Amino acid sequence: MDYQNNVSEERVAEMIWDAVSEGATLKDVHGIPQDMMDGLYAHAYEFYNQGRLDEAETFFRFLCIYDFYNPDYTMGLAAVCQLKKQFQKACDLYAVAFTLLKNDYRPVFFTGQCQLLMRKAAKARQCFELVNERTEDE
């Protein structure tokens, strides 16, 4: 009986790995509906706005793990890290968000803020100059 459990667990792990390797998210693998993800995001955002950063971080982390293609989740987690003064971690997350957002330079701007707060003025300036060069006045 244990052998069958191990084989089926190995098969499930293999199927999940194949799905993720082909671009599926854990949200897709587990069949989590988008409206549930939207509800979790609403809670995360509410916690963020209330200054309940630990709770917001927990929700945003879950959202990022289950749907790593959604830049809103990554931006949310990065913003939480920025407010918690985890500036390097925030910069790393903003970099991920920027790759997902392509031509949206908000993550670069927020990275510049983090660089300033880490007393890295030259890097901050590079970020702000890039934002200035690549965005149009709206």
Descriptions of predicted regions:
Residues M1-D35:
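Long, contiguous interaction/recruitment modules in multidomain scaffold/adaptor proteins
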Residues Q34-L101:
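Alpha-helical adaptor scaffolds
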Residues M75, Y105-F110:
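Non-catalytic amphipathic alpha-helical adaptor/oligomerization segments
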Residues C91, F110-C114, T135:
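Functionally engaged cysteine thiol sites
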